[in-house]
């Protein structure tokens, strides 16, 4: 149940908030929001949220980004 709520929040962000930005800003593939969905789906709410937050903290101008899939 909580997993579905988290994924719904991320999907809401992807559909309504992310398009407001002028250009895509995520430095990674898959995007941080897609990574979060995959992490929560694969590892559950606690570990998935932890992995997603860790990934979001890496998404800044001083990190090179690149291909970073869920392991």
UniProtKB/Swiss-Prot annotation:
It is found in: Cell membrane. InterPro entries: Membr_insert_effic_factor_YidD. Disulfide bonds: none annotated. It is a peripheral membrane protein. Its main location: membrane. Coiled coil: none annotated. It comes from the Bacteria. One of its GO terms (cellular component) is plasma membrane. The keyword GTP-binding does not apply. Keywords: Cell membrane, Membrane. Pfam families: YidD. Could be involved in insertion of integral membrane proteins into the membrane. Belongs to the UPF0161 family. This is Putative membrane protein insertion efficiency factor. It comes from Ruminiclostridium cellulolyticum (strain ATCC 35319 / DSM 5812 / JCM 6584 / H10) (Clostridium cellulolyticum). The lineage of its organism: Bacteria, Bacillati, Bacillota, Clostridia, Eubacteriales.
